[in-house]
Amino acid sequence: MKLDGSIAAVVTGGASGLGEGTARALAAQGVKVALFDMNAERGEAVAAEIGGIFCAVDVTSDEDVAAGFAKARAAHGQERLTVNCAGIATGQKTVSRKREDGSLRAHDMASFERTVRINLFGSFRVLSQSALGMASAEPMADGERGLIVNTASVAAQDGQIGQAAYSASKGGVYAMTLPVARDLSSEGIRVNTILPGIMWTPMMAGMDQKVQDALAAAIPFPKRLGTPADYASLVLHLAQNVYINGECIRLDGAIRLAPR
């Protein structure tokens, strides 16, 4: 896929973090970008800066996702690239003790379900609706109709203590990559997944610098946190290399997460 002004893209979670970095990188190539996010103020600002459009979308809502694609396609035409970056990170042990009195409690099921609903169901909802549109488009070079890039996490393979819900949600994204790529192969639609390691995102900004430095020191090489630019660079490569399909790629500086 040649990334230029003939290509339209949708980036979920595009108002911040990995999604924003990807949206900016695509726009720099001339790609017409639609941002799906719930943060309207930030999303509108980023869209204005990159010459894209913002669509207020909650990925857990069928109606929001359908309306977002309708708005994006009306403005830019059928997207050929969709990047799923919307997601949340949560932490709670399967069974834990309260610090106050040592009493036991089980993992909150509402929190578990919400994590899976956003990270896994949300990714598949966007993926399937984008693929539906791509399948109706005319093939490009090599017979390709489009590419969908999902975001899992190294926690899908190296889940830490307290990451049962998060690892399950990202593990689902990881596990569905190959079967979905096979499902869509006859339509000329590729599907790949990126498993980011410890990345600098707005969630990191509130952490003490010493904590950030310690996290960076644990990474074999390069000894720094990953950046949205690192992620975006891989998205661009996946778009341009048509032979990469059905793959889950770790982007982590060779780190393997310890139990805690």
Regions found by a protein language model. Name each.
Residues 185, 190, 244-247:
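Short, small/polar-rich loop/turn modules that mediate ligand/substrate recognition or access, typified
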Residues 127, 169, 177:
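Active-site helix of classical SDR
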Residues 132, 181-183:
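Alpha-helical segment proximal to the catalytic Tyr-Lys
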Residues 227-251, 256:
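C-terminal substrate-recognition "lid" of short-chain dehydrogenase/reductases
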Residues 2-34, 180:
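Canonical Rossmann dinucleotide-binding motif of NAD(H)/NADP(H)-dependent dehydrogenases/reductases
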Residues 153:
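Residue(s) in the substrate-gating loop at a strand-loop-helix junction
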Residues 77, 89-113, 132, 136-142, ...:
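Conserved mid-core segment of classical short-chain dehydrogenase/reductases
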